[in-house]
Amino acid sequence: MKHQWQQYQAILNAVVKPALGCTEPICAAYASAIAASMLTSEPESVSVHVSDNLYKNSMGVFVPGTGKIGLAIAAAVGAIGGNAEAGLEVLATIEADQVERAQAMIDAGNVSVSRTQTDEFIYCYVKAHSGDDVVTVEISGGHTQVVEKTLNGEIVFAKEVSATTSTAGICDGVDISIAGIYDYATQVSFEDIRFILDASELNTKLSAEGLANEYGLQVGRTIDKSIKDGFMSSDFANNILMHTAAASDARMGGASLPAMSNYGSGNQGIAATLPVVMTATHYQANDELLARALIMSHLGAIYIKSHYPPLSAFCGNTVTSAAAAMAMVYLAGGSYQQSCFAIQNVMSDCSGMVCDGAKSTCAMKVKTSTGSAVNAFMLAIQSTAAQAQGIVADDVEHTIRNIGQLVTLGMGNTDTTIIDIMSA
């Protein structure tokens, strides 16, 4: 395999992984589980300090297996029942009595949550004590990237700053572009990318769960009912919207099923996966074609998002759906140029959508961006593309750089304002 392709696969392996529950509160649960594993008995108290952006994305989302919302329950149940070896699936095996004990710890005033000033967008510091022992766990630069652990004031683990790999810089030093991603996805050995089919399996199960049960705003179930009631047609576009939104409903509603995440986001993993899976079904594509399309979608999304900070004020589902549209064109037999048209079309459509935290209404944003992907795909296969106007440039790479500039230089104050509004 080419060195460049090996780098691409390493990127995918690093940030396309199963995650149970919204990754921001799960980050706190993971840190707490590690802290608890360092103690000889169950923690008596837990304090959590997080970055503004991690705080924002934890305020309104259900923690799986608990039926409850927020960082406090995530940290408490992580400390009492979390599996420190399970990464983003830290809460996969929690039980009802552990949730009750976690809530009792909160009710007793032994769990605290606060914001802390830091340059890192993804940052979580947990302090736990039991008896005479006090432990701390610090996560920085990635949802599971532990950079320091202490026991009774002594450092027992530390990762040098120069050795840390922040997800924000995951494409740094890599020869990567939309053209390179397209070539990799269409030419690499199927056996080297077969693993991405797990995304189809996990996120399809999550969609089925969201359609079968009541989660969040029930966006997917509402589309399903509207189709059955004759208000909407059962067609290619609406079925994609229904299944994609339903998975997000379940994800945000605390379903105890993992999503295959993308770049730290389960919703974006859903948006990168299900429109592609549904398109593959429509065109009766085999597993190899589906895998190639999923690689195109997931890696394309990662590449575009690497141009701006994670957990910013910009809703990442927008650019994720742009990459999904690119992959949909591929499955329809379109050309590379038409795939680029699809990206341009999405970028011109809904690239102004803001992130105001993870919550049940994310399912509506997933539906919106996915709808944009479907429209962009339909235009692109007719060789229709947005022209060089506004933030959309003559070529797709220039447009992607423009998006990065918009978010990095133009939306910092937006992010601060959103967090201030949410915290008021």
UniProtKB/Swiss-Prot annotation:
UniProt-recorded Gene Ontology molecular function terms: L-cysteine desulfhydrase activity
Matching InterPro entries: Ser_deHydtase-like_asu, UPF0597
GO biological process: one example: L-cysteine catabolic process to pyruvate
Superkingdom assignment: Bacteria
Homology family: Belongs to the UPF0597 family.
HAMAP family for this protein: UPF0597
Protein name: UPF0597 protein Ssed_2537
